[in-house]
Each structure stands twice: as C-alpha cells, then as structure tokens.
C-alpha cells in the first residue's frame, strides 16, 4: 500500500483497520509518561487522529479543528497519536490553548504503526506514521477509518463527525 508525501509515493506497511473491525489493541505513552491503552477509554467513543508530528502545519491544524468540533461531546475522546515526545505535545497544547485532547506517543511502542497499518517505510518521514483517522464506538468497533492519501492533506472532517 502507498500514500504520497508532497506527491511522491511512499510505501506503508501493516494492516490498516477497516470499518466494522475491532480497534486493535495498543499501548501508548501519555502526556504524564504513563501508559495508555484501550481499557483507558472503555465506554467512550474514540477519534484517533494519527499523524507524523504535531510540529507540522497540517498536523497542528487538524488537532485544532477536531478539538473544536468535539469540544462539547462528553462521550468522545480525541486521541492524538504521533512519534512526538509527550513534552512536545504538551508544549503545543499549552502554546495553542488546546484542551480536551488526549496526547499519546508511540515512541516506546514503534510496532504501533505496523499494527495500525500506518508505518512509513521510506523517504524523509521513514519511521513516522502516515496521516490517518480511526473512529471507534463505545464498544471498540470501528465506525470510520481514513488513511489520508497525501500526507500533507487534511482528513475529511465531515465524514469523521458523521461517523460518531
């Protein structure tokens, strides 16, 4: 499977989850440096926004757009996942007044990108995650899955929100 980065093909590996699948198990590092996993979000809908780095324009914009769109939804968690260290993600949220977001890093668990089918195998971003959004209901069943074809593009916000 491939995506593009600045219109150049980049191969990705792993199996990208599909609508109707159960959300794959994961263990990520939270902002407080403690582990986060599926059980921490039991009974909540999850919008998992996966991206290369919070310090890129499209990644930061998508976090802000989703945070604003989900601000009033107490039944939904916005889980932002990248290779960024938790310190960088916390800094971003403080500097940009982003709240109600759960930041998580796969820096301790690089196999996350394979398990979720977003591992960039080549090019300048090799080892980071492709841009994707996966929405799961309160039972852990996927209701939306989008692997963004061009890494520098934003996800389809309308489809994300309609899937909740």
From Swiss-Prot:
Task: Please give the name of this protein.
Answer: Thiol peroxidase
Residues of the Thioredoxin domain: 17-164
The alphabetical list of record keywords is: Antioxidant, Disulfide bond, Oxidoreductase, Peroxidase, Redox-active center
What is said about its interaction partners and assembly?
Homodimer.
Name the enzyme's class.
Answer: oxidoreductase
Reading the lineage from the top rank, the first entry is: Bacteria
Q: Which residues form a coiled coil?
A: none
| Organism expressing this protein natively | Vibrio cholerae serotype O1 (strain ATCC 39541 / Classical Ogawa 395 / O395)
Which reaction equations make up its catalytic activity? a hydroperoxide + [thioredoxin]-dithiol = an alcohol + [thioredoxin]-disulfide + H2O
Molecular functions (GO terms): thioredoxin peroxidase activity
Q: Gene3D superfamilies from the xrefs?
A: Glutaredoxin (3.40.30.10)
| Active site (catalytic residues) | 59
Listed HAMAP family: Tpx
Entry's EC annotation: 1.11.1.24
Q: What does this protein do?
A: Thiol-specific peroxidase that catalyzes the reduction of hydrogen peroxide and organic hydroperoxides to water and alcohols, respectively. Plays a role in cell protection against oxidative stress by detoxifying peroxides.
Q: Which InterPro entries match?
A: Redoxin (IPR013740), Thioredoxin-like_sf (IPR036249), Thioredoxin_domain (IPR013766), TPX (IPR002065), Tpx_CS (IPR018219), Tpx_Peroxidase_subfamily (IPR050455)
List the CDD domains hit by this protein, alphabetically: PRX_Atyp2cys
């Amino acid at each position: 499977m491939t995506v593009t980065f600045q219109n150049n093909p980049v191969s990705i590996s792993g199996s990208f989850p599909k609508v109707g699948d159960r959300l794959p198990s994961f263990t990520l590092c939270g902002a407080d440096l403690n582990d986060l996993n599926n059980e921490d979000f039991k009974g909540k809908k999850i919008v998992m926004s996966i991206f290369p780095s919070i310090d890129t324009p499209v990644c930061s914009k998508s976090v802000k757009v989703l945070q604003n769109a989900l601000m009033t939804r107490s039944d939904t968690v916005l889980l932002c996942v990248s290779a960024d260290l938790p310190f960088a993600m916390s800094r971003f949220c403080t500097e940009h007044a982003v709240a109600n977001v759960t930041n998580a890093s796969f820096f301790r668990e690089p196999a996350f990108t394979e398990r979720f089918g977003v591992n960039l195998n080549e090019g300048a971003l090799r080892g980071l995650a492709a841009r994707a959004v996966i929405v799961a209901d309160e039972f852990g069943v996927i209701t939306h899955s989008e692997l963004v074809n061009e890494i520098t593009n934003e996800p389809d916000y309308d489809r994300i929100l309609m899937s909740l």
